[in-house]
Amino acid sequence: MSNTQITSQAEKLALIRESERMTRKQVAELTGINYNTYAGYEQGKVKMSFDAGMKFFKPERFRKYRDWFMFDETYPAGGQIAPALAHIGQDSTTLHHSDQKTG
């Protein structure tokens, strides 16, 4: 299992939706969560309840993100991944300076 580090629930919801190339309206329709309620979750105005989380992860399309969303963990062999747009591991990458001249 690998760890990932996205902190806010709102940011995670947006990354999942954007990685699936969906609109907020499409997510609301797929999950059965009221559009305005879902938009509030994604905008960070209110935290998603456990019941809403169950609705969100019920569609098979979103199940692959469940461990990442809840525990900041992925397990690709078990089908648990992070969204493509999450840019996992960026802050742990070090760029080394090169003394080579270009041009």
Segments the model singles out, each with a brief description of its role:
Residues L30-I33, P59-R61:
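A short, basic/aromatic helix-end/turn motif that makes direct DNA contacts
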Residues M1-E20, T102-G103:
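A short, Lys/Arg-rich alpha-helix, primarily the initiator
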Residues R17, A28, F57:
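The alpha-helix within a helix-turn-helix
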Residues S2, D67-G103:
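Short, charged recognition helix plus adjacent turn
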Residues G32-M48, A52:
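Recognition helix of helix-turn-helix/homeodomain-like DNA-binding domains
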Residues F50-W68:
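DNA major-groove recognition helix of helix-turn-helix/homeodomain DNA-binding modules
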Residues L13, V27, Y38-Y41:
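Conserved hydrophobic/aromatic packing and binding residues within compact polymer-binding modules
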Residues M22-K25, S49-F50:
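Short, charged amphipathic recognition helices of the HTH superfamily
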